[in-house]
Each structure stands twice: as structure tokens, then as C-alpha cells.
């Protein structure tokens, strides 16, 4: 019985060896050299054809795209709003007596407003207010000046602490960029707070967003563009450590939406400020 098992094992091993290489027929794993060559040639041609077809398809598709402007823009017809400094949960918390508690906010604002410095904006165009700055035919797009000094006491020039040291912080409300957007009417940022005895002051006056900063032509062609912003100074009448909820919306333009239950940042932004002694 043991001899029969050994004989079976030897036979099985011999069959495997013969399958891997059969010297009598000149076969490797059941195929001759010419058979393997034909199979390899077939797959080489087949996958080469697929790669060529994919490359051709991608090339044709890329010919239909503009390097500077997205092909499909109909799904983003109205811009969203965001604030600076942007913190986790859009909650700004600090103690006015502890400099370290708000220095990160101050540094963020300085970094954000650096491109708005008057020395940099002097290189841009002085544009007539209230008019679109159309440049469809221009290859190199120019930019209208938006000077940092127009943000008044929220510019960080008069008060390097942006009001945080006195417990009256400044928050920058910015509009997200959309290529080709032309707001109608007289757009402006308007903010409200449910907390009583809170004064909101805007820079520029009335939270105005001038039309001369539109349209935007894209990052690649509109190199020096800076979007218009509105600074909001939040001045509570007392410091009770109560959380101040502020909601800012775009108003005054019928083609800019500010209400959408599916997108809480479409034309609006809500943030909270908590100030302690």
C-alpha cells in the first residue's frame, strides 16, 4: 500500500515537471515557443490599441477645453461667502486681556490683507466706480485697485490688533470668486445679530461691493486680481462672555442668492464671536 502511494507521488511530480517543460515536444507550460510568441504579440497589439484609443480620446477632449475658463459653469451661478479669520466651526473666541488668545487671528488677517496693501494696489488700475470692468478682448487682464486703507479702522493700519485688544474685533467677509459673474443692481453685505446691544460697523461704508471688480476672468489670466471684501467691526456694549451669533448676507442684487437650505454658505455666512475679559 505504501509502495503504491509513493509511486503515485512520483508520477504526480513527473507530470508537473513535464507540464512545466516537455523536452520531447519542446513545450513550456503546454505551449511551444512560437505559440507563446503569438500570444504575447496578440496582447501587445491589443493593449497597445487600447492605450492609443485612450490617448486619442483624451487628446480630443482636451481640445474642447479652455485652459483658463471652466467649460461648465452653470451649476455655480451665485457665490458663497466666507470670513477671515476662519476658525474651526467658524467660532472666534478670545480674551481681550490676553494677547496670545487672539494673536493667531491678527496674523491671519494680516496675511489675508497683505495683497491689498496700497503699495501693491498702486500697480493696478484706478477704475470708475459703479461700472463693470469688461476685458473680454484683452489677453492680459488688468485689476481694479482695492486699497487696504478703504477698510478704515479694520485695515490693521490704524489699529494693528484689528480691535481684538479692546474687545471690538474686526471680521473680513469675502465673496468667493466665480468666473464671469456680473452682479446686478447694487450688491452689499448686510449683517445681523440676534444678540442685543451689539453694534455692527461696515467698511467700506454700508458694506458696498462695487461693480468695478467684476467680472473675474480666472486665476491664470487675471493674475493680480483680489476680490472685493467688506470688514465688519463687532462692538458689544458689555462683556458678559455671551456668545454673539452674526449672520451676513448679500443683498441688493437680484441675481445673487442668499437663501438655500441645501447650501448654508450660498450668499451668506454665519459665525459666532465670544469675548471675555
UniProtKB/Swiss-Prot annotation:
It comes from Xenopus laevis. The keyword Glycoprotein applies. Keywords: Cell membrane, Disulfide bond, Glycoprotein, Ion transport, Membrane, Potassium, Potassium transport, Signal-anchor, Sodium, Sodium transport, Sodium/potassium transport, Transmembrane, Transmembrane helix, Transport. The lineage of its organism: Eukaryota, Metazoa, Chordata, Craniata, Vertebrata. It holds the Pfam family Na_K-ATPase. Belongs to the X(+)/potassium ATPases subunit beta family. The chain crosses the membrane at residues 36-56. This is Sodium/potassium-transporting ATPase subunit beta-3. GO terms for biological process: intracellular potassium ion homeostasis; intracellular sodium ion homeostasis; potassium ion import across plasma membrane; sodium ion export across plasma membrane. This is the non-catalytic component of the active enzyme, which catalyzes the hydrolysis of ATP coupled with the exchange of Na(+) and K(+) ions across the plasma membrane. The exact function of the beta-3 subunit is not known. Nervous system specific. Its main location: membrane. It is found in: Cell membrane. GO terms for molecular function: ATPase activator activity. GO terms for cellular component: sodium:potassium-exchanging ATPase complex. It is a single-pass type II membrane protein. Residues 57-277 are extracellular. InterPro entries: Na/K_ATPase_sub_beta (IPR000402), Na/K_ATPase_sub_beta_sf (IPR038702). The keyword Glycoprotein applies. Gene3D superfamilies: Na, k-atpase alpha subunit. Disulfide bonds join 127-144, 154-170, 191-248.
